[in-house]
């Protein structure tokens, strides 16, 4: 009996393999975006420059401290940990669904004790009977002739694969978030150093002006103007101290652990990226490699597979229940010859009247597929805009940096000239103060543009799908 049951299981599995499926043929929707990215460099050579998703984050970021901070975040960040656990959960759910493809075989041992009163026995006396049985069998195994179970299995598989892409997408976002937080801290630290230096310079200028005022060489207006600039620099220094502290708190949160002081930057690095320039590539190819786009496509494939299950529900479902074993009135008799028992119960269920439930279920599945198509297309459009915005910013950053550096040089020269003219008695103190303000503002603006340039490299790397390796 046991060998027959095993043979039956093999036959059923083979029958399942040859069963049909009603999942619609999947066709990837066309990307609703232009054929090329605007502002992409025309000299880019795909053969010479690898795509962003092929560049590991360790190879992309130039600063060793930043690489170490990112490595810490990948180990300790809770959001990434949740994404990894979601993969384990989806994998387990897929295994549960996949198990329905095969018969579930179980063993049962039972004892039945029954007492009958004398009125119901031939002897006229009360009798107690016992029955022992031991069986192995399967219960309600569905023969998947129309692919309902396999469609649900395909849906579960796509959902599981989608969580894999979600984890990759979460890692890309984490790498970019850590890099931007680290760079922001570096910029604010540099701004703080500039504010402190400016405060010290203005403090010296204020002290000199006070002495000149006491000697009657300058007016009270000059003294108050010097005091105004001094307090402005003091306020800026306090504000940037607060920004630096907040930056460190944000960095500790995203990393998931306190950071050693030696990993925190005091100024923006000259080059945040070790890669000179990322190629934009062809939108339809580049965007299709982004994990968030792949996740959206997995959701679309899952919805498409669910249509197959909804279609199969219109057709008969056949299930089998079978068991084989032994039975005896005594425990020792279970192993005697002639005690074998077996049962075989096929069951077919044919939907006749469901009050529109099956049609409605199919409509829901098809509408959900259409929703996922729209979400997939929206994800591509959003990704295209991210890349296009980053490229548009990159196209002007070099010019902005050159202009800001030239402005700092010009204002510094103007300040030195104003200082010399003031000391020579040619210009008023007001002209010197204006030159100080202009130079300070130009230096702050240059730090901001340098931060934008570094952050643009991070944004473009993320937008092009880099950072998950």
How does the language model describe each region?
Residues 2-75, 157, 241-288, 294, ...:
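Terminal intrinsically disordered/low-complexity segments used for targeting and assembly
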Residues 92, 99, 165, 172, ...:
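Regular, well-ordered alpha-helical segments
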Residues 149, 158, 165-282, 393, ...:
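Periplasmic alpha-helical coiled-coil/stalk elements that build and connect Gram-negative outer-membrane
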Residues 213-217, 422-426, 463-467:
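A short glycine-centered flexible hinge/capping loop motif at secondary-structure junctions
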Residues 216-219, 383, 390, 425-428:
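Alpha-helical heptad-repeat coiled-coil segments that mediate oligomerization/polymerization in large
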